[in-house]
Protein backbone atom coordinates (compact mmCIF):
# COMPACT_ATOMS: atom_id res chain seq x y z
CA UNK A 1 0.00 0.00 0.00
CA UNK A 2 1.33 3.44 -0.94
CA UNK A 3 1.97 5.92 1.88
CA UNK A 4 2.98 9.55 1.13
CA UNK A 5 5.74 9.40 3.78
CA UNK A 6 7.11 6.54 5.84
CA UNK A 7 6.26 6.69 9.56
CA UNK A 8 9.93 7.37 10.33
CA UNK A 9 9.92 10.74 8.46
CA UNK A 10 8.32 14.14 8.92
CA UNK A 11 8.38 17.48 7.08
CA UNK A 12 9.91 20.47 8.90
CA UNK A 13 11.64 23.77 8.18
CA UNK A 14 15.09 23.08 6.74
CA UNK A 15 18.38 24.89 7.21
CA UNK A 16 19.22 23.83 3.64
CA UNK A 17 16.20 25.35 1.87
CA UNK A 18 12.52 25.86 2.68
CA UNK A 19 11.04 22.61 3.96
CA UNK A 20 12.80 19.27 4.21
CA UNK A 21 12.43 15.66 5.29
CA UNK A 22 13.63 14.75 8.78
CA UNK A 23 14.02 11.45 10.62
CA UNK A 24 11.53 10.99 13.50
CA UNK A 25 13.60 8.06 14.73
CA UNK A 26 16.91 6.35 14.01
CA UNK A 27 16.93 4.83 10.51
CA UNK A 28 19.38 2.05 9.72
CA UNK A 29 21.72 1.96 6.72
CA UNK A 30 20.18 0.22 3.70
CA UNK A 31 16.58 1.11 4.60
CA UNK A 32 14.23 1.61 1.65
CA UNK A 33 12.37 4.84 2.46
CA UNK A 34 9.98 4.43 -0.46
CA UNK A 35 9.20 5.82 -3.89
CA UNK A 36 10.31 9.38 -4.70
CA UNK A 37 9.46 9.51 -8.42
CA UNK A 38 7.49 7.48 -10.95
CA UNK A 39 7.84 7.75 -14.72
CA UNK A 40 4.98 6.55 -16.91
CA UNK A 41 5.71 7.04 -20.59
CA UNK A 42 7.01 10.60 -20.97
CA UNK A 43 5.49 11.87 -17.70
CA UNK A 44 7.48 12.08 -14.46
CA UNK A 45 5.50 12.15 -11.21
CA UNK A 46 7.05 13.30 -7.93
CA UNK A 47 5.73 11.89 -4.66
CA UNK A 48 5.76 13.84 -1.36
CA UNK A 49 8.93 11.90 -0.51
CA UNK A 50 10.57 13.26 -3.67
CA UNK A 51 9.06 16.71 -3.31
CA UNK A 52 10.49 17.60 0.09
CA UNK A 53 13.97 16.09 -0.06
CA UNK A 54 16.79 18.64 -0.30
CA UNK A 55 20.14 18.47 -2.10
CA UNK A 56 23.50 17.85 -0.46
CA UNK A 57 26.97 17.13 -1.81
CA UNK A 58 27.26 14.67 1.09
CA UNK A 59 23.84 12.96 0.95
CA UNK A 60 22.60 10.30 3.36
CA UNK A 61 20.30 8.60 0.82
CA UNK A 62 20.64 7.55 -2.81
CA UNK A 63 18.12 6.68 -5.48
CA UNK A 64 17.66 3.27 -7.04
CA UNK A 65 15.79 2.84 -10.30
CA UNK A 66 13.44 -0.04 -10.99
CA UNK A 67 12.60 -0.51 -14.67
CA UNK A 68 9.47 -2.60 -15.16
CA UNK A 69 9.31 -5.02 -18.07
CA UNK A 70 5.91 -5.77 -19.54
CA UNK A 71 5.78 -9.50 -20.26
CA UNK A 72 2.48 -9.14 -22.17
CA UNK A 73 4.38 -7.17 -24.85
CA UNK A 74 1.98 -4.25 -24.58
CA UNK A 75 3.92 -1.01 -25.11
CA UNK A 76 4.48 1.00 -21.95
CA UNK A 77 7.38 2.60 -20.10
CA UNK A 78 7.51 2.41 -16.33
CA UNK A 79 10.33 3.46 -14.02
CA UNK A 80 10.22 3.85 -10.26
CA UNK A 81 12.84 5.69 -8.16
CA UNK A 82 13.21 4.57 -4.53
CA UNK A 83 15.36 6.18 -1.84
CA UNK A 84 17.80 3.96 0.08
CA UNK A 85 19.77 5.15 3.12
CA UNK A 86 23.56 5.18 2.65
CA UNK A 87 24.32 5.11 6.38
CA UNK A 88 22.56 5.12 9.74
CA UNK A 89 20.55 8.33 10.15
CA UNK A 90 20.04 9.90 13.59
CA UNK A 91 16.68 11.03 14.93
CA UNK A 92 16.19 14.69 13.95
CA UNK A 93 18.67 14.54 11.05
CA UNK A 94 17.61 15.93 7.67
CA UNK A 95 17.32 13.44 4.79
CA UNK A 96 19.27 14.64 1.73
CA UNK A 97 20.17 13.41 -1.73
CA UNK A 98 22.45 14.55 -4.54
CA UNK A 99 20.18 16.12 -7.20
CA UNK A 100 20.96 14.14 -10.35
CA UNK A 101 18.98 11.81 -12.56
CA UNK A 102 22.08 10.63 -14.40
CA UNK A 103 25.88 10.60 -14.10
CA UNK A 104 28.06 12.52 -16.56
Q: Locations of the language-model features?
A:
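Conserved catalytic SET/PR domain of SAM-dependent protein methyltransferases, capturing the structural core
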Residues: 1-104
Amino acid sequence: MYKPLPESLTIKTSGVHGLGLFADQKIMRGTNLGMSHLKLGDTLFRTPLGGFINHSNTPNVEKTVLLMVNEDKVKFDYKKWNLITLRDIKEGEEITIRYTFYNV
